[in-house]
Structure formats: structure tokens, C-alpha cells
């Protein structure tokens, strides 16, 4: 299976369609260490690094899903590259509840109101592409060049 970049037409999305019983918040700097710790514990250090890039801005581009004052998911945009969405993660116990889609849409809304017309979701596995198509109508970019090829360990 190969990874593809995906394209999202932000003009074609309905940002009011998300209704879940979980709160989604834009990360504030006093919470950034908690978010980085959560991501490192549940996902990966590289995702935690990407989230740091999204949080340490005047206008943070990282959102968290919160249930009973506990972080249960996160998503970022403009972290690794401008106009790119990701990473996205939801705690195992909270999957299949629409939280991932809600986080995707919150970031897509952020991208739209930050002036973007389109978003790119980088390096998506074939297995995960259906999730993004269902969440935000993301389609593969044929022959896309991968931003992650610039990683030091590649």
C-alpha cells in the first residue's frame, strides 16, 4: 500500500454539520505541555513535534477534544507545512464516535477562515483514505510530492 497526499476543497464543506457530545477547543499555551504529553504517550514523538509547531504560534492551529476535563483527541493544521492538515489522533476508547471527523472539520474550518481555499492531507495510507473522503470529501492528488520526504531520517 502506498501513501498519497489528499486534497480537500474547503469551499465545498459544511462546517455546521458536526454535532458530538465532546468539547473541541483550540489549544491555549498553558495547556501545551499536557497536549504534547498526551500525544507522546498515545501516538508518537514525531506527532508530538508536529503539534508543538502548531501550538507555539500567536494563533495556535491545534485543537483538542475534551471529555470531563480529559484530552481524548487532537488535530492540527499548518504544522509541518502551510495548508497541510495533520496529525490527527483519537484515544482508543473514544474512536468510532465521530470525534475524529469533528476534529478534522474544526481544522478545515480553521484553514478556511485563515484564508485557504484548499487543504492538503499529507501522506495518507490507502486504508485511511476512506475515512478522510467520508469526513471531508478528500481526494487523492495524483503523483503528489511528499512533504515528509524532507525528514532527516528518510
What is each stretch, according to the model?
Residues 104, 125-128, 148-150:
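Short glycine/proline-centered loop/turn elements that form peptide/ligand docking sites
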Residues 22-35:
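A short beta-loop-alpha structural element at the N-terminal edge
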Residues 111-124:
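Conserved GNAT acetyl-CoA-binding A-motif
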Residues 40-92:
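A conserved beta-strand-loop-helix scaffold within acyl/acetyltransferase catalytic domains
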Residues 133-143:
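Conserved acetyl-CoA-binding loop of GNAT-fold acetyltransferases
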Amino acid at each position: 500500500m502506498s501513501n498519497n497526499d489528499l486534497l480537500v476543497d474547503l469551499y465545498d464543506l459544511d462546517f455546521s454539520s458536526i454535532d458530538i457530545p465532546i468539547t473541541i477547543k483550540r489549544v491555549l499555551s498553558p495547556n501545551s505541555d499536557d497536549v504534547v504529553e498526551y500525544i507522546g504517550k498515545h501516538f508518537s514523538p514525531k506527532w508530538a513535534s508536529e503539534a508543538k509547531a502548531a501550538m507555539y504560534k500567536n494563533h495556535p492551529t491545534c485543537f483538542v477534544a475534551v471529555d470531563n476535563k480529559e484530552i481524548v483527541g487532537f488535530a492540527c493544521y499548518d504544522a509541518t507545512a502551510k495548508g497541510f492538515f495533520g496529525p490527527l489522533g483519537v484515544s482508543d476508547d473514544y474512536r468510532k464516535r465521530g470525534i475524529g471527523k469533528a476534529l478534522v472539520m474544526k481544522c478545515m474550518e480553521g484553514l478556511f477562515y485563515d484564508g485557504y481555499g484548499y487543504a492538503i492531507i499529507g501522506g495518507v495510507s490507502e486504508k485511511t483514505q476512506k475515512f478522510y473522503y467520508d469526513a471531508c470529501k478528500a481526494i487523492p492528488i495524483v503523483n503528489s510530492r511528499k512533504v515528509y520526504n524532507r525528514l532527516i531520517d528518510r
